[in-house]
Amino acid sequence: MPELPEVETTRRGIEPALVGKRLCGVVVRQPQLRWPIPVKTLEKELVGQVIQQVARRAKYLLWRCPQGTLLVHLGMSGSLRIVPEHTPPAKHDHVDWVMEGGQMVRLHDPRRFGAVVWIPVTSPEEEHPLLAKLGPEPLHRSLNGRYLHQGSRGRQLAVKNYIMDQSVVVGVGNIYASEALFRAGIAPAQAAGKVGLGRYRALACAIKAVLGDSIEQGGTTLRDFIGSDGKPGYFVQSLNVYGRAGKACPKCGTTIEKQVLGQRSSYYCPQCQRA
């Protein structure tokens, strides 16, 4: 599943093809994604608009224009590619946005868990049900050790599950949670309410560093993710623990272990990450 670094990589990739350009048409070959695509609404409200900004909130891409905002979510296996106009579609190429200047932005989504939603200008974007309850952005200064510490008091769930809660902080998916906890030296199964302020400060720094490093390397390609230029992400080469059960810890040489928390695989070093 594309996580925050992959979505931010996509945003940066498609931005030059969209911002300041007029959208000349939309071609929907398969409207049945996570929710039905509002084809007639897009043809009426979006076509002819100039895209003013391509933003990101959590894992949602927001194409802002005078009449509203197009919200795009990549789902489990989606990607956006920039292709020349009239490029024949491949299997699972469900939507084309045709831009002035001879380029298209194409949505490829094999599993069809992605979403294309129109938010009219008359509806406050931040109040949309998909956006209203999201926590702070992990790279923003509002995400810090004190914030994580205060929100965790009295909570018994595993600290890994705590930082993956999108109402606590957005965009810390399974891969990046494992990697950030490793960098901070915190056991993933430790109760969130028992982690001290100093360790949460280290964890907040680790979250920012892991996500920042991944964005700089174009995200993490394990299976489905391909950037807007057709290239994979390379952060997979920098993973310390995720997917490395049975291998040596890069810090101390102890065998990396795997456990399931909240129905997700977690990877950690039992020596470096003690409760």
Swiss-Prot record:
**Is Metal-binding set as a keyword in this record?**
yes
- Which prosthetic group or cofactor does it need? Zn(2+)
What are this entry's molecular-function GO terms? 8-oxo-7,8-dihydroguanine DNA N-glycosylase activity; class I DNA-(apurinic or apyrimidinic site) endonuclease activity; damaged DNA binding; zinc ion binding
Q: Describe cofactor binding as the record notes it.
A: Binds 1 zinc ion per subunit.
Zinc fingers (FPG-type) at which residues?
A: 240-274
Catalytic activity entry:
Hydrolysis of DNA containing ring-opened 7-methylguanine residues, releasing 2,6-diamino-4-hydroxy-5-(N-methyl)formamidopyrimidine; 2'-deoxyribonucleotide-(2'-deoxyribose 5'-phosphate)-2'-deoxyribonucleotide-DNA = a 3'-end 2'-deoxyribonucleotide-(2,3-dehydro-2,3-deoxyribose 5'-phosphate)-DNA + a 5'-end 5'-phospho-2'-deoxyribonucleoside-DNA + H(+)
* Name under which the protein is recorded: Formamidopyrimidine-DNA glycosylase
Query: Which source organism does the UniProt entry give?
Result: Magnetococcus marinus (strain ATCC BAA-1437 / JCM 17883 / MC-1)
Q: Which gene encodes it?
A: mutM
